[in-house]
Every structure is written in structure tokens, then in C-alpha cells.
Amino acid sequence: MSLVLYGHPLASFCHKVLIALYENGTPFENRIVDLMDETSSADLFRFWPVGKMPVLRDEALDSTIPETSIIIEYLDRHYPGPIRLLPDDIDRALRVRLWDRFFDLYVQAPLQKIVTDTLRPEGRKDPHGVEEARGTLATAYGMIEQQLGGNQWITGDSFTMADCAAAPALFYAETLVPFGDDQPKLRAYYERLLGQPSFARVLKEALPYFKFYPYSRQLPERIRNEMPSE
């Protein structure tokens, strides 16, 4: 198969690319990487020595594509499907890129900081950094609430790359800093994302791995009820 995605079912940034692939039914091989296993991770580091997932390998064009937004734009150009995840109109495309960056930088980054800090041993934790990260999430929620207005999706009526970024970011962030009662549009948007077939498929595939998430008890009840019993 021409396209091979190196990633992991628990990783939120991998979810973002999987949503894009599933939205358009793009054929690809989903290769799960265990970073703790040298054999499993060998190809990832060979193609992208930084070792960050996901990485897309296009064997047909002998191309290695890292970074989620670049991967999705690459797919949109070289393997277009019925759903254009990046509009042709320049101004609309800029809005999509802006909100794609917003979710990566101001939702994903702070949630990653909080989760990473949880895994640190005592004496190496960063309570000040965690407090800042929680504050960033709270600010981001308010901005998303305002941006949504009457939109179905984050930049309008069309599902785009920005919504691919939003889905996993909000899914994990909500387990750390729940949405406020004064954010009904954000909550409704979150529910629409959960109901999107592409994201529902991603979450279903991640069910066996959610037990490794440090905040698994804060996952939505509907997800916890579907997780395999140990």
C-alpha cells in the first residue's frame, strides 16, 4: 500500500490525522509504533529521527511527511477525496489554518504539559507550569465559545482540518479542565465532534489503550463503558 501512517492509537496528534484519513476513506496502512520497542520504532526513527508521531510515508512518491497539519495538507493535495479539508479560497484557508494552529498550540500543548507532569516522579513536578497550562485551557475554551457563534463547525458549516485538530484536543482537554456551564456552544460542538463517524471510529480503535491514559477515570462515561474489562 502506498501510504503508511506510523503512530499510536492513544496519541491525540495521531487521532488528528486518522480523522482526516477516515473522513475521505483514504486507503492506508496503519502501523502502530511502540516507542519502547527498538524493532517497532526502527522505521519511525529511520524516516524521521526526531521520533515524533505521527509520520506519513508515501512509498509511491518516496516521500516522508511529518507534522500533522503538513500531513493533512499533503493528503488534501496528493490524495484528495470528496471532502476538502482545506478550502480553495485563500481567506477561508487562512482561517482554517489559524484554528488548526490554535487547537494544537493552545489546547493540545497545555494538556500535554499537564499529563506529562502527572508522569514525573515527586521532586521533579512543575506545579507552576501545570497551573499556567490549566489557565491557558480556560482561556482557550472562552475563545472557542466566542468563535463558534452560530457555526456548526469551528470555521463555518464545513468540516475542515481545524475540526480534525479540535476533536482529539478537546476530547483529552475536557478530562483535565471540564467545560464550564457558561460554554454551551463549546459543549454542543464537542458533542458534534464525538458524533462524527470518523472520530467515533478513531475512539473505538483506541478503546483497548485508554486504560494507559493517566486520567482514564475522567473519560466520558460512554467511553469508559465501552472499554474492555481487564
Task: Map each language-model feature to its residues.
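GST-like fold's C-terminal all-alpha helical module
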Residues: 103-198, 202
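Positions that flank functional sites
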Residues: 35-36, 159, 208-209
